[in-house]
Amino acid sequence: MGEVLDVVVVGAGSTGLGISYFLKREAREHKVLDGGRIGETWRTQRWDSFRLNSPTIRSVLPGDSYRGPDPWGAITHHEFVSYLEDYADRHCLPVCTQTSVKELTRQNGLFRLTTAPGVLLARNVVIATGDQNRQVRPPASADLPVELC
């Protein structure tokens, strides 16, 4: 099975990439796995008009500083995906896309992650798969035109 990684991070969204940044900075041997592409849920599980619900300046990931025209504006999810991809590239983060974790078990004090390409062993696993991919509407909004929601 090969080497034992210090950490495997599951999820290549903003949290997973931010964790990877710090792991790399501390020279921890790790990989980031995502079943899709970087920021996959931002690509496929957001409605067309979705914008981040915080000012752009608050969405800057570790090791970066804000660059852009409107620090207090709200960027689209498409712009955020581009930022995530650029961030991973600029910081040379070890992201493995199209790599779903099929099974996670403990074996001899290590975590065993089964993926389509093979099995990984790690001392630690971080699950960073997100929780903000569902639209929530109050019941009273049912009578509003869909373009307002």
Indicate where each model-derived feature is located.
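Glycine-rich active-site loop/strand segments that organize a redox cofactor
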Residues: 33, 43-81
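Short hydrophobic core segments
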Residues: 8-10, 101, 119-133
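Glycine-rich dinucleotide-binding loop and its adjacent helix/turn
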Residues: 76, 129-149
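Glycine-rich FAD pyrophosphate-binding loop
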Residues: 8-10, 21-47
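A conserved short coil-to-beta-strand element within the FAD-binding core of flavoproteins
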Residues: 97-111
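Helical element adjacent to the flavin cofactor pocket in flavoenzyme catalytic cores
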Residues: 78-95, 101, 132-135
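Beta1/beta-strand and adjacent pyrophosphate-binding region of the FAD-binding site
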Residues: 2-15
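Conserved Rossmann-like nucleotide-cofactor binding loop
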Residues: 15, 37-38, 132
